[in-house]
């Protein structure tokens, strides 16, 4: 059974790409992401944010969720919660990479949060997609790969997000790995490569991995090793006592 898809437009870089919205997908514009949906002629089902990065007018209506500027949850997490609470488990996220490095790191952290709750987020960057996988396997379909062209069109990198990731196997790539343990302080999985007309997989038995792959690839199929419970929580518009000034 296919997962409900949510496409989120954030306020970061789009690298000249035209986002693709699958039929039936939920569309959420997060703050300045509304500038992009308007420019593309895409109707957002929900608009959310404190609107500090929006350059056009703030819409009014029941589908606009205005957040305070001081809060614990960043706008992207709030958008993810809205999508999750409406049944989405696959999130395609544009404009969440590039620009401020702290925003980029936060976006990558949020893909790990999704993975650890049984969802998946794909962050679209400059010719690359970033995702996270937790206790699961990613399967990439075989396709033609040009071994002499731009290396980014075949590059795959794998990082441990959890303190350690156990039972990591990489199959069908230029450099294979079997039942290894990766840690988040030793970088061993950078710059692997997809091979021509060869299916590939990245598997982690226990732990969370961050994976980057070419945006020209079809999105991988995900097989989870167990059921996941819990959710992302309710929309939070408060500042915790630990952060209060």
Placement of each model-derived feature along the sequence:
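Non-catalytic positions within long, well-ordered alpha-helices that form the structural scaffold/packing
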Residues: 38-40, 84-87
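Long, charged alpha-helical interface segments
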Residues: 133-245
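Structural motif
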Residues: 9-13, 97, 213-215
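N-terminal beta-strand-loop-alpha-helix module at the start
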Residues: 1-57
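General beta-strand structural signal in soluble alpha/beta enzymes
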Residues: 9, 28-30, 49, 65-66, ...
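Short phosphate-binding loop-to-helix
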Residues: 64-85
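Short beta-strand segments
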Residues: 8-10, 31, 94-96, 124-125, ...
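Anionic-ligand-binding alpha/beta catalytic cores of soluble enzymes and soluble regulatory domains
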Residues: 92-141
